[in-house]
Amino acid sequence: MNIKEAQAITHTLSKPGKMPGFAYSTPAHECKTGTILRDVDKSVCKNCYAYLRGRYRFKNVIDAQYKRFRSLTHPKWVEAMAAQINSKKVKYFRWHDSGDVQDLDHLRRIYEVCRLTPEVKHWMPTREAWTKDYSP
């Protein structure tokens, strides 16, 4: 799969300014746990940096995040993500500089992308505590 085909499936990767590599951001509005924790005082999600703050509030950023979000169940998502990450020749990749894991299928697909990108160190901070039970 070439990069143009991959981007047609997953949209482009994001490039957070404070990270040494690329990332894959989805809308903070769609966080399963974060949506609940946003209303809890002193929770880490209460003042979420990706929830309508900074560049995350711009329409073009939100549109890109929703394109990525809608792509998560595409049958070729894993292949497309691996192609894009491998093409960047980076050492590090961050999952969800905005957004979070949606469900077990999403988590398993991320693990498969990691398997297909062995030269890259993946980082996935999450508030979805259940994911710890499914480490590969």
What is the meaning of each model-derived region?
Residues 1-136:
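Class I S-adenosyl-L-methionine
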